[in-house]
From Swiss-Prot:
Site (May play a role in transmitting local conformational changes): D107
Catalytic reaction annotation: 1,2-dihydroxy-5-(methylsulfanyl)pent-1-en-3-one + O2 = 3-(methylsulfanyl)propanoate + CO + formate + 2 H(+); 1,2-dihydroxy-5-(methylsulfanyl)pent-1-en-3-one + O2 = 4-methylsulfanyl-2-oxobutanoate + formate + 2 H(+)
Gene: mtnD2
Site description Important to generate the dianion, residues in chain: R110
Protein EC: 1.13.11.54, 1.13.11.53
Molecular function as annotated in GO: acireductone dioxygenase (Ni2+-requiring) activity; acireductone dioxygenase [iron(II)-requiring] activity; iron ion binding; nickel cation binding
Pathway listed: Amino-acid biosynthesis; L-methionine biosynthesis via salvage pathway; L-methionine from S-methyl-5-thio-alpha-D-ribose 1-phosphate: step 5/6
Protein name: Acireductone dioxygenase 2
Lineage of the organism: Bacteria, Bacillati, Actinomycetota, Actinomycetes, Mycobacteriales
Family: Belongs to the acireductone dioxygenase (ARD) family.
Organism: Nocardia farcinica (strain IFM 10152)
Cofactor: Fe(2+); Ni(2+)
Key words, A-Z: Amino-acid biosynthesis, Dioxygenase, Iron, Metal-binding, Methionine biosynthesis, Nickel, Oxidoreductase
Role this protein plays: Catalyzes 2 different reactions between oxygen and the acireductone 1,2-dihydroxy-3-keto-5-methylthiopentene (DHK-MTPene) depending upon the metal bound in the active site. Fe-containing acireductone dioxygenase (Fe-ARD) produces formate and 2-keto-4-methylthiobutyrate (KMTB), the alpha-ketoacid precursor of methionine in the methionine recycle pathway. Ni-containing acireductone dioxygenase (Ni-ARD) produces methylthiopropionate, carbon monoxide and formate, and does not lie on the methionine recycle pathway.
Binding site for Fe(2+): H102, H104, E108, H146
Length: 191
C-alpha cells in the first residue's frame, strides 16, 4: 500500500497526516514540487529481464523523458535470497547506503515496478515519509534533503532515471535526523 506520513522534523511523534489515499498523497507532494504518479504493474515483473521490463514500459519512459534529459535509465533489483549465506550482509549494506540524510545534484526519479521502499523528504519543518510500492513513480527534485529505507528484507524492482551516470551518488549532510524517524518496517506495522 502506498502511504504518506507527514511528521514534524523535530518530533516524529507529531504526525500531521497519515493517508493511503492516492489523490491526497499526490496533492500533498505536488504542493512541494514533487511528482507522484501511478503506472500499471506487471504481475510477473520479477520474472522479466531488465531489458524486457524497460521494453514493456518503453512508451511511458519515452513520455517521461520526452526532453531527453535522462541519458541513463536502468533497473535496480534486490530480492531476498535465503539460500545465499551472504545475502543478509549484502542486504544490510545496500540498506545502510542511503539511510542517512543526503541530497542529489539532479532529480531522483524512480518507478517501482514491484516491491516497496520509503523516501523520507526533509522539507523545512516537516519530514514526509512516502512508502512507494509497485506502480508508484516519484520524482524528488534536485537538492531535496532526503533519505531512503528499503526495509529489513529489501525486495523491490525500480526503474531509475539519471541525467548523468553518477547521478545516484549522494551528497551526505552529516545530520543524523533519520535515526529519529520510524523505519519503513515501523511505518508498515503502525496502526
Amino acid at each position: 500500500m502506498t502511504l504518506l506520513q507527514v511528521m514534524a522534523a523535530d518530533d516524529a511523534a507529531r504526525v500531521r497526516l497519515r493517508t493511503t489515499e492516492e489523490a491526497a498523497i499526490a496533492a500533498e507532494l505536488a504542493a512541494h514540487g514533487i511528482t507522484f504518479d501511478r503506472w500499471p504493474v506487471l504481475d510477473d515483473a520479477a520474472a522479466l529481464s531488465s531489458d524486457d521490463l524497460l521494453a514493456h514500459y518503453a512508451d511511458r519512459i519515452a513520455a517521461l523523458n520526452a526532453d531527453g534529459r535522462y541519458r541513463h535509465i536502468d533497473v535496480a533489483r534486490i530480492h531476498p535470497d535465503d539460500a545465499d549465506p551472504q545475502w543478509p550482509q549484502t542486504a544490510r549494506a545496500a540498506r545502510t547506503k542511503f539511510l542517512d540524510e543526503h541530497r542529489h545534484a539532479e532529480d531522483e526519479v524512480r518507478f517501482f515496478a514491484a516491491g516497496r521502499g520509503c523516501f523520507y523528504l526533509h522539507l523545512g519543518a516537516e519530514v514526509l515519509a512516502v512508502v512507494c510500492e509497485g506502480g508508484d513513480l516519484m520524482s524528488v527534485p534536485a537538492g531535496t534533503l532526503h533519505w531512503f529505507d528499503m526495509g529489513e528484507r529489501p525486495d523491490f524492482i525500480a526503474v531509475r532515471f539519471f541525467e548523468e551516470a553518477d547521478g545516484w551518488v549522494g551528497d551526505f549532510t552529516g545530520d543524523r535526523i533519520s535515526a529519529g524517524f520510524p523505519t519503513l518496517d515501523d511505518l508498515l506495522t503502525a496502526p
